[in-house]
């Protein structure tokens, strides 16, 4: 609103009594040496006001095009960096996928090894239990054999007495079987 009032002041002829009815208006007159300076001073704010309010592309400043081009270049660089980062992410993802497959294979091998170890432990437990049963059986058999040997030893102890008894019986029989001399 203030800018439009200053434009109106510049367009009107000097000496127009607009401020007579307005208490905020100050009538300021400037002394210029020639009329060219007056025209330049009056035309400069008008051009500035037109430049600020104008949206015409023909009147846009040259730095605006450079700035827009820089923004496009920055946008292209950001886009390229996104592509590069995406490619890096894909490469890393591929590497991690390979590592995961390797780890999965190693884990499978470890789990197979653990399963084999458990099976071997179960088999070893079964063999140990069978060996313990066989040892108990052998101990029982040894007990029976020892008892039989002891019984045999006890019988052998009586054999010499039996042999002497048999010898005495044989001698007695021999005596009876010999003819007696007649007298």
Swiss-Prot record:
| Record topology, Cytoplasmic segments | 1-70
Q: Which residues are glycosylated?
A: 109
Q: Which UniProt keywords apply?
A: Glycoprotein, Membrane, Signal-anchor, Transmembrane, Transmembrane helix
Q: Which cysteines are joined by disulfide bonds?
A: none
GO terms for cellular component: cell surface; membrane; protein-containing complex
Q: In terms of one coarse class, where is the protein primarily found?
A: membrane
Which stretches does the entry tag as region Disordered?
1-26
Mention one GO biological process in which this protein takes part, according to its record.
inflammatory response
TM region(s), chain numbering: 71-91
Q: Where in the cell is it found?
A: Membrane
Source species, domain of life: Eukaryota
Instruction: Read off the InterPro entries from this record.
Output: MCEMP1
Compositional bias (Basic and acidic residues): 15-24
- Which topology term describes how it sits in the membrane? Single-pass type II membrane protein
The residue spans the entry assigns to the Extracellular side of the membrane are as follows: 92-183
Name of the protein: Mast cell-expressed membrane protein 1
**Species name:** Mus musculus
Q: What gene codes for this chain? A: Mcemp1
């Amino acid at each position: 609103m203030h800018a439009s009032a200053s434009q109106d002041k510049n367009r009107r002829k000097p000496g127009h009594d607009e401020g007579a009815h307005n208490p905020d208006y100050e009538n300021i007159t400037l002394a210029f040496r020639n009329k060219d300076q007056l025209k330049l001073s009056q035309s400069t704010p008008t051009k500035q006001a037109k430049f600020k309010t104008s949206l015409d592309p023909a009147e846009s400043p040259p730095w605006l095009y450079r700035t827009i081009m820089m923004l496009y270049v920055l946008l292209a660089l950001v886009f390229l960096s996104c592509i590069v980062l995406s490619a890096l992410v894909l490469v890393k993802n591929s590497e991690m996928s390979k590592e995961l497959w390797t780890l999965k294979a190693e884990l499978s091998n470890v789990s197979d090894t653990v399963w084999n170890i458990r099976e071997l432990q179960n088999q070893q437990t079964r063999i140990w239990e069978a060996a313990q049963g066989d040892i108990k059986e052998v101990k029982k058999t040894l007990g029976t054999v020892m008892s039989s040997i002891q019984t045999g030893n006890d019988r052998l102890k009586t054999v010499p007495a039996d042999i002497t008894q048999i010898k005495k019986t044989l001698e007695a029989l021999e005596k009876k079987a010999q003819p007696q001399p007649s007298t």
